Curated annotation (Swiss-Prot):
Pfam families: Hfq (PF17209)
Designated name of the protein: RNA-binding protein Hfq
Family: Belongs to the Hfq family.
Organism of origin: Pseudomonas fluorescens (strain Pf0-1)
Keyword annotations from UniProtKB, A to Z: RNA-binding, Stress response
Amino acid sequence: MSKGHSLQDPYLNTLRKEKVGVSIYLVNGIKLQGTIESFDQFVILLKNTVSQMVYKHAISTVVPVRPIRLPSATESEAGDAEPGNA
């Protein structure tokens, strides 16, 4: 994973796994809403009544409908290890 994706991928993956609704604002001002079905390096599949493939270079902002908690770097590396048990 490249350094530029160290926040983007876990953020999008959390939104996908928890099926959090999102508003995606495009650079031209259009607002799309739905849930993230899948994503890769270049696109996000957004599902509402239909699935739309949205190119990441066209996205300005991704806004979840509720706050989400991202796993910390130590949690994702340590797996089941609990904080404070070093």
